[in-house]
């Protein structure tokens, strides 16, 4: 399945919630009718079956983290193999993705921008270049911006925007040095996003 290249706001409207695909400079409600699906029949809200609800939740989480279907299914299988709660394991794996950590630290205004920084070799993990967005960050890993990329205005602007977000307990951030430390893997209770991972587990368990 190819990566979606269409309007990001359309995806948020499809899911009926902000998927954080835009920078957040303006509230998403000022840009589109978030509670109305796209298309000429958007005002109609058909009642979803249990399967429909499960599918929508999976699509929502995939789009939030920018992961393709095959890769997402792979994360689920790995989550099911690990000890503990499968749903929590799944979200923890997604949170450990390098592009997500770069976004959470604030180097990228969106996960898509963070992914681009990674693929363009602007990001270091423990002082070594890593250009794989799906690379899983481990506790105590240091994620930083390469010195020659630190002059990019978009990174500076993103850090200013991220200062307005809620601080995350599992990250230690030094904005002036453009360094973030992934202190520990977050527990489910502190991972935000309005996600019901149980629906995804039910979907894949069939």
UniProtKB/Swiss-Prot annotation:
CDD domains: S4
Keyword tags: Ribonucleoprotein, Ribosomal protein, RNA-binding, rRNA-binding
GO function terms (MF aspect): rRNA binding; structural constituent of ribosome
SMART domains named in the record: Ribosomal_S4, S4
Disulfide links within the chain: none
InterPro entries associated with the record: Ribosomal_uS4, Ribosomal_uS4_bac-type, Ribosomal_uS4_CS, Ribosomal_uS4_N, S4_RNA-bd, S4_RNA-bd_sf
GO cellular component, one term: small ribosomal subunit
S4 RNA-binding domain sequence ranges: 96-159
UniProt-listed GO biological process terms: ribosomal small subunit biogenesis; translation
NCBIfam families (UniProt xref): PRK05327.1, rpsD_bact
Recorded family membership: Belongs to the universal ribosomal protein uS4 family.
Function: One of the primary rRNA binding proteins, it binds directly to 16S rRNA where it nucleates assembly of the body of the 30S subunit. With S5 and S12 plays an important role in translational accuracy.
Subunit structure of this chain's protein: Part of the 30S ribosomal subunit. Contacts protein S5. The interaction surface between S4 and S5 is involved in control of translational fidelity.
Name of protein: Small ribosomal subunit protein uS4
Organism: Hamiltonella defensa subsp. Acyrthosiphon pisum (strain 5AT)
Gene: rpsD
């Amino acid at each position: 399945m190819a990566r979606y290249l269409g309007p990001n706001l359309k995806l948020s409207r499809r899911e009926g919630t902000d998927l954080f695909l835009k920078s957040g400079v303006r509230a998403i409600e000022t840009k589109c009718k978030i509670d109305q699906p796209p298309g000429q029949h958007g005002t109609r809200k058909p009642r979803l079956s249990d399967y429909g609800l499960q599918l929508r939740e999976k699509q929502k989480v995939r789009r939030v983290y920018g992961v393709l279907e095959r890769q997402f299914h792979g994360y689920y299988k790995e989550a099911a193999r690990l000890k503990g709660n499968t749903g929590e394991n799944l979200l923890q794996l997604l949170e450990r993705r390098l592009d997500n950590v770069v976004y959470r630290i604030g180097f990228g205004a969106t996960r898509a921008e963070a992914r681009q920084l990674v693929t363009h070799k602007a990001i270091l993990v423990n002082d070594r270049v890593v250009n794989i967005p799906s690379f899983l960050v481990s506790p105590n890993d240091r994620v930083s911006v390469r010195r020659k990329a630190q002059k990019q205005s978009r990174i500076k602007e993103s850090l200013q925007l991220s200062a307005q977000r809620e601080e995350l307990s599992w990250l230690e951030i030094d904005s002036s040095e453009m360094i973030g430390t992934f202190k520990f893997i977050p527990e489910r209770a502190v991972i935000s996003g309005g996600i019901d991972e149980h629906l995804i587990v039910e979907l894949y368990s069939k």
